[in-house]
């Protein structure tokens, strides 16, 4: 039976704490030990913290409903290899970088990842995560061997590195000479994302952004951090795919309904969503469907974001 961890003052902060512990109030930090992060930015695993408004790790126990599911039972080494079949092709710049062991090691830092909900939900989350990240790192083309959706994880860095992706920020100032272009599976970009991610992982990624493209475990951790972390007004990708996100009336009027399409909106909605049919969105869906088929799970509804208003724009 899981130990119940309680804050000293119910919904509010413990008396001996001066600042919030997690969530958007703490730069996207996750609670230790898989604890729930309440809507107010505090850690515990009581219903008050894990229920309505919970920001992350909302199963509260660091290991899914059964208290300790092994992620390896959801995605085996052989499945990983088949999903990312051509990632080590000689033509792929990331050849030899992304490994199953690095993925499993990184995932241990996020106990709710791939372990929330029933088995189908867990499989669907892994399919969605790799669907989005495979698109971000794809080396495929329409007539590629085994099809375009067998070429995810071919890249670990953005091809166009001319932009510094530096947005003035007192909280996450850009380091001299550093660029925050896309790196890793999720193609983490912008100084504020590197800053928040670094805080959550205990790393100085503002001064060392290349760690996301040179350390294979950190690379996966950065991608999973982005996946697990809500950034207002966006929910987390994790909460969407596991059914823990409920759209507000504003979301509904903007066409944002639960499903894989909202995850695309979270990741790159400003460029891809609300524009009608888009080849990039279609590519994301193609990867997702291939992986769902491999896991023998349904796709769910609302796969695209063609008619969704991007978050923050309406």
UniProtKB/Swiss-Prot annotation:
Cross-referenced Gene3D superfamilies: 1.10.530.10, Endochitinase, domain 2, Endochitinase-like
- Known SUPFAM superfamilies for this protein? Lysozyme-like, Plant lectins/antimicrobial peptides
Ranges for domain Chitin-binding type-1 come to 20-60
Signal peptide range: 1-19
Query: Which key words tag this protein in UniProt?
Result: Allergen, Chitin-binding, Disulfide bond, Plant defense, Signal
Cysteine pairs forming cystine bridges in this chain are 22-37, 31-43, 36-50, 54-58, 92-154, 166-174, 273-305
Q: Name one GO molecular function term.
A: chitin binding
A Pfam family it matches: Chitin_bind_1
InterPro entries (UniProt xref):
Chitin-bd_1, Endochitinase-like_sf, Glyco_hydro_19, Glyco_hydro_19_cat, Lysozyme-like_dom_sf
Is Ribonucleoprotein a UniProt keyword of this protein? no
What are the recorded Gene Ontology BP terms? carbohydrate metabolic process; cell wall macromolecule catabolic process; chitin catabolic process; defense response to fungus
The answer to whether the entry has keyword Disulfide bond is yes
Q: What does this protein do?
A: Inactive chitinase-like protein that does not exhibit hydrolytic activity toward chitin. Binds strongly to chitin and possesses antifungal activity toward the fungal pathogen Altenaria alternata in plate assays. Inhibits the growth of Fusarium oxysporum on plate assays. Probably involved in defense against fungal pathogens through a mechanism that only involves carbohydrate binding.
What family is reported?
Belongs to the glycosyl hydrolase 19 family. Chitinase class I subfamily.
Its name, as the record gives it, is: Inactive chitinase-like protein 1
Source taxonomy: Eukaryota, Viridiplantae, Streptophyta, Embryophyta, Tracheophyta
This protein's gene is called CHI-L1
